[in-house]
Swiss-Prot record:
Its EC number is 2.4.2.7. Keywords: Cytoplasm, Glycosyltransferase, Purine salvage, Transferase. NCBIfam families: apt (TIGR01090), PRK02304.1-1 (NF002632), PRK02304.1-3 (NF002634), PRK02304.1-5 (NF002636). This is Adenine phosphoribosyltransferase. GO terms for molecular function: adenine phosphoribosyltransferase activity. Homodimer. It catalyses: AMP + diphosphate = 5-phospho-alpha-D-ribose 1-diphosphate + adenine. It is found in: Cytoplasm. Catalyzes a salvage reaction resulting in the formation of AMP, that is energically less costly than de novo synthesis. Belongs to the purine/pyrimidine phosphoribosyltransferase family. GO terms for cellular component: cytosol. It is an enzyme of class 2 (transferase). It comes from Blochmanniella floridana. It comes from the Bacteria.
Amino acid sequence: MISHTDHQLTLIKENIKFIPNYPKQGILFRDITALLENPHAYSACIKLLADHYKNHQLTKIVGVEARGFLFGSPLALILKLGFIPARKAGRLPRNTISESYVLEYGTGCLEMHNDSIIPGDRVLIVDDLLATGGTIKAVVKLIRRLGGEVYHAAFVIDLEKLGGKLLLEKIGVHPYSLVIFSD
């Protein structure tokens, strides 16, 4: 018999589309827009993440631009936590700190308001996908520079062969993913 959780995970997997050669040649993009269009699949993601983290004594959630906002914001509401956006450079109005990083298919820079984390905050990072881990490593650096503690990061998808999980574990962050693709 299939458990309710297994049914939810199957629903999530069925709503992730594969787009070859996007955003550039040689990349197999995992598209979550169909998942977002299906309220049952989207809700299943949020519920499973909330169930996993409800007893972790967190104080804040940081969502990574832009798709991390889609999962981090509703998760923060359910867990009754503050939500902090980690945004691309130049998009936040107050004083910020920044960190550069390397993507699977380029480079980037993320910023956070320099007063959004207070020393001792226990922070969960949320994004849609874990690839190489470079983006999340940059967010971890930002949070730790502000005095926050970060030991957990949540994802809908983990592209296992790209090594992000291993990178995060090396810096003391435990990744949790709903769906793991090993291809």
